[in-house]
Structures are given as C-alpha cells and as structure tokens.
Amino acid sequence: MAESLLELKKKIASIQKTGQITEAMRMVSGVKLNRTEKLDQEYTIYNDKVRATVSHLMSSQIVNQLGKETNEYSEFSGQSNIDYSSFFDLGTLASLVQPRKEIKSTGYLVISGDRGLVGSYNSQVIKNMMSIFKDADAQNKDVKILAVGSVAAQFFKKQNLNVVYEYSGVSDVPTYNEVRDIVQTAVKMYLNGVYDELFVCYTHHVNTLTSAFRVESMLPISDIDINHKETMPKDYIIEPDIDSVLKTVLPQFAKSMIFGAILDAKTAEHASSMTAMQSASQNADDVVSGLKTKLNRARQAQITTEITEIIGGANALE
C-alpha cells in the first residue's frame, strides 16, 4: 500500500508540473494573440481599401489600355535575381492583370505553422488542402505548392506533392518586410509560367474559439473578389498616368494580400494554441483532482487497515 501511495504522489507531482508548463504556454499565447489580433483588425481596414481600389481599377476601362490578352511570359523568365520594383513595367502589368487563355497549372500558397502544440490549427490546414488537391487530381489538374510554414511543407513532401517553394520562421508577430521574399517568389513564378493562376490559402481568425479556412485568388489580379456592393465608376481620371498608378497600386496589393493572410493566420494560430493549452491545463487539474481523491481513499484504507490490525492485536493479548 505504501508503494502505491508513493506512485500516486509521483503521478500527481508530474502532472502538476505539466499543468504549470501548459498554463505558462497559455499565458504566452494569450499575449501574442492580443498583439496580433489588434494588428490584424487595424490592417484589415487598410487591406480592404487596397483590394477595393484594385478591384475598381480592374473593372474600369483603363485595364484595356495595358494591351491585348497574352499568354506570353515576361522578359524576366529564367532569371533568378530580380529587383522587386522591376516586376511592374507596363508589359509585366499586362501579364499580371490579364488571365491566360489556358490554365495548365494552378499554384497554391499555403500558410501553416512551424510547430505543434497549436490544437487543430495545422491539421485543419492540411485537411482542407488535401481535399482541394484530391479534387484537382480527379480533374487531372497540375498543382504547384508554395508552403509558408514547415508543418505543411514537410507533410506535403511526404505525400510526394509538388512543393516548389517553402518558407519557414515567420515571426510570432509578423512584420511587413518578412513577406518581401514570399511576394517576389510568388510573382516571379507566375511570370515565369510555373503556374497560370495563384490562390492564397490560410486560416481566417474569427474569434478566440472560431476560425475559418479561406482560399482567395491572387493572380491574375483581374480574378480578385471583394465583399462590397459599391457602384463602381466605368472609368477614372488617372494622374500622372496609368503606368505610374498601377506600378504603385499593384505591388501594394500583392504585399498587402500576402501579409494580411499571414497576419490573420498567425492570429488564428495563437488563438488555437491558447485554447489548446487552456484545455490541457484544465485536463491536468481534473486528472490531479481525481488522483488526489484516489490518494485520499488509499490513505483512508491504509489507516483503517492499521487500526484494525492494532485492535486485533490488542484483543489477542486479552
């Protein structure tokens, strides 16, 4: 019985330590969530305005002045070191705006986490993407994957899927500069004909307990969709010229879309982590409570046995 009591005490101590760790992780995730949630809410306002501006421009007559629809890839094809600003010359703008006549390959920029202990966050990303890839395979569609986050990248490679780019190590509170390489690569691959359309796939943060998986079109830019019902003018007065305006607006659109998705996904990841650690801490408390009850019963049984033995011995002496 003494050995059993000792084992129970060891279990209680071990689980209490685990509970302390998960509680500390919950608090850390909560701090990160507060920071990213505030940034996400503020950035969403800016991001929606950029998307609305681009959507308005795409629906106006100025796009027709960029040239006829083309399936030709840009002059940057085959180059590896491209200056970011040089993406957006007039010919390249036409390539980014006009849909291609034939969709031979589809790119998916998938945002996941770099580590576990985040609840169902990563598994839901993978589950949703595998469903998309299964449908694409059934239709004999070629798929190219750009993976932001090591969890998804490693899983997709184990499944022998075509991961053409991977990026890991995004900060817990992402910065605008971090998306630079991702945007450059995504646009360059589109211009080089690696894929003919690109979708950004990520987890949208709704609230602490709720998230929603989103798949949004990024390239070609004419395919973007926004949630507004404003009456859009048929044309604009452009100053100083179309080229200058689009060279400014389209890079902002590309960066804001990817950064917004990463920031939103990080917020959802922190919320999932906090919820998971809170649940783990509560489970640890419940297990400890059950073990303490079991320990007290074992102690009571031990005391009862000892008293019975003492009484029995005393009676034997009479």
UniProtKB/Swiss-Prot annotation:
Q: Which InterPro entries match?
A: ATP_synth_F1_ATPase_gsu, ATP_synth_F1_gsu, ATP_synth_F1_gsu_CS
Q: Which residue stretches, if any, does this entry annotate as coiled coil?
A: none
How does the UniProt record describe the way this protein sits in the membrane?
A: Peripheral membrane protein
Alphabetized UniProt keyword annotations: ATP synthesis, Cell membrane, CF(1), Hydrogen ion transport, Ion transport, Membrane, Transport
Compartments where found:
Cell membrane
Please list the GO biological process terms of this entry.
Answer: proton motive force-driven plasma membrane ATP synthesis
Where on the tree of life does the source sit, at the highest rank? Bacteria
Q: Does the keyword Cell membrane apply?
A: yes
Q: Which SUPFAM superfamilies match?
A: ATP synthase (F1-ATPase), gamma subunit
An example molecular function term from Gene Ontology annotations: proton-transporting ATP synthase activity, rotational mechanism
GO CC terms of this entry:
plasma membrane; proton-transporting ATP synthase complex
* Known function: Produces ATP from ADP in the presence of a proton gradient across the membrane. The gamma chain is believed to be important in regulating ATPase activity and the flow of protons through the CF(0) complex.
Q: Which family does it belong to?
A: Belongs to the ATPase gamma chain family.
* Alphabetical list of PANTHER family matching this protein: ATP SYNTHASE GAMMA CHAIN, ATP SYNTHASE SUBUNIT GAMMA, MITOCHONDRIAL
- What is said about its interaction partners and assembly? F-type ATPases have 2 components, CF(1) - the catalytic core - and CF(0) - the membrane proton channel. CF(1) has five subunits: alpha(3), beta(3), gamma(1), delta(1), epsilon(1). CF(0) has three main subunits: a, b and c.
Q: What is this protein called in UniProt?
A: ATP synthase gamma chain
What is the organism of origin for this protein? Lactobacillus johnsonii (strain CNCM I-12250 / La1 / NCC 533)
